[in-house]
């Protein structure tokens, strides 16, 4: 039972849906960071 429980918990820990959501989250986080970086640069250019 220990082995099948390990395999089951692994499936629950890293399902394909979670992996896709994690990738989306990383992409959104990167976009948010670049947007935050671009805004101050654009503001200083306007000044």
From Swiss-Prot:
User: What residue spans carry the Basic and acidic residues bias annotation?
Assistant: 18-30
> Keyword annotations for this protein?
Host cell membrane, Host Golgi apparatus, Host membrane, Lipoprotein, Membrane, Myristate, Virion, Virion tegument
Compositionally biased region (Low complexity): 32-47
Residue ranges of the region described as Disordered = 1-47
**Principal localisation:** virion
Q: Which GO terms describe its cellular component?
A: host cell Golgi membrane; host cell plasma membrane; membrane; viral tegument; virion membrane
Q: Where in the cell is it found?
A: Virion tegument; Virion membrane; Host cell membrane; Host Golgi apparatus membrane
- Membrane-topology annotation of the record: Lipid-anchor
Query: Does the record carry Plastid as a key word?
Result: no
Residue positions of covalent lipid attachment, annotated as N-myristoyl glycine: 2
What is the role of this chain? Plays an important role in the cytoplasmic envelopment of tegument proteins and capsids during the assembly and egress processes. Also participates in viral entry at the fusion step probably by regulating the core fusion machinery.
Comment field (misc)? The PsHV-1 UL11 is much shorter than the other family members.
Q: Into which family does the record put it?
A: Belongs to the herpesviridae HHV-1 UL11 family.
Q: What is this protein called?
A: Tegument protein UL11
Q: Write the gene name.
A: UL11
């Amino acid at each position: 039972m220990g082995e099948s429980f390990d395999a089951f918990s692994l499936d629950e820990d890293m399902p394909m849906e979670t992996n896709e959501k994690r990738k989306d989250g990383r992409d959104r986080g990167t976009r948010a960071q670049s947007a935050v970086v671009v805004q101050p640069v654009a503001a200083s250019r306007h000044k």
